[in-house]
Amino acid sequence: MDKYQDRYLAHQKRKAELLKSSYGTPDFQTYSKEEQDTFFTVVKNRCSQRSFVSEEIDISNILYAIDRSPNSCDRKGVYPVVVSERKDKEILSGLLVGGVGWMHRADKIILLIADMDCYKNPAEKGFMPYLDAGALLTSAYLAAEVSNYGCCFVNPNIRDENKEFFMSRFGLKDNEILCGALAIGKYELKHTR
């Protein structure tokens, strides 16, 4: 057994206990009309930002949102790696095809890395890590928006001749894959949202 299977079994136990319990208990969180409106305003206003200013940001709330995101049976097979060193950001800006020429200006880049040992069913290995990463990045986008930070998803496309260097430089193991990256920073106010 591994940590992913342990998390899966704990998830199954929680789910079984929930199904045995009565729904609608006073502990169940509900939201006021005002809270609902605020949430949907955040959803409506969220947009991708590729223009950043040089200002350090605190992404602890974004990392918290990523940690609390839904994922395959709560296994947490996709995890974030924060890149903040200028040299590493410049390297990523050259390696990730979608980030060329702008991504290094973000204060932080979050790599979404999948540990393929988490995914047990061979039929799911080709898509499930990307679905999990999608849930994480949605939470990160909304957390960035409510924190007044710009955020943009960069697809995991790396040219074949650069993949080995990327894996080595950013410490990925043979059983790990990049599912994408998020560039996050204070956005340039002169650009319309």
What are the residue ranges of the model-derived segments?
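N-terminal amphipathic, basic helical "cap/leader" segment at the start of enzyme domains
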Residues: 1-108
